[in-house]
A protein has these predicted regions:
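Generic detector of short, locally flexible boundary/turn motifs and exposed helical patches
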Residues: 3-7, 16-18, 29-34, 56-59, ...
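Short cysteine clusters
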Residues: 49-52
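Extracytoplasmic electron-transfer domains, predominantly the class I c-type cytochrome c fold
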Residues: 38, 42, 56, 60, ...
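C-terminal capping alpha-helices of c-type cytochrome domains
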Residues: 2-24, 93-112
Length: 112
C-alpha cells in the first residue's frame, strides 16, 4: 500500500511541477506598443527590412539578426543609426527622417 501512495504522490508532484513550468513559460514577451514603437514597426515594414534581417529568428539571411542588436556590446543605437544612414557593402543607405529613425531605433529596442 505504501508503494502505491509513494507513486501517487510522485505523480501528483510531477504533474504540479509540469503545470507550473507550462504556465511560467507560456507568457508572451511583452513588446511595448507605444506610438513610437508602432511607428518604428511601420518604418521597418515599409523599407522591407525583414527581407534581409531576422527578428525573433524569422526573416531573411543576408543581414544579421536584429533581435538583440541594441544590447549587443559595441553596437546599440549610435551604431545602428550610422549603419542605416551610411550603409555598407551589403546594405544600402537609407535617408530616413529624424522621426522615422528615432521610431525605428525604438522598435529595435523593443524587440531587443
Amino acid at each position: 500500500m505504501w508503494k502505491v501512495l509513494a507513486w501517487l504522490s510522485l505523480f501528483v508532484a510531477s504533474l504540479g511541477y509540469s503545470v507550473w513550468v507550462y504556465c511560467a513559460s507560456s507568457r508572451e514577451p511583452s513588446i511595448t506598443d507605444s506610438e513610437t514603437v508602432l511607428a518604428g514597426k511601420k518604418v521597418f515594414q515599409q523599407h522591407n527590412c525583414i527581407a534581409c534581417h531576422q527578428v525573433y529568428g524569422l526573416g531573411g539571411y543576408l543581414g544579421p539578426d536584429l533581435t538583440r542588436l541594441m544590447s549587443t556590446p559595441g553596437k546599440g543605437s549610435r551604431w545602428a543609426n550610422a549603419v542605416i544612414r551610411t550603409g555598407n557593402e551589403r546594405m544600402p543607405a537609407y535617408d530616413l527622417t529624424e522621426a522615422d529613425m528615432a521610431a525605428l531605433l525604438e522598435f529595435l529596442s523593443a524587440v531587443d
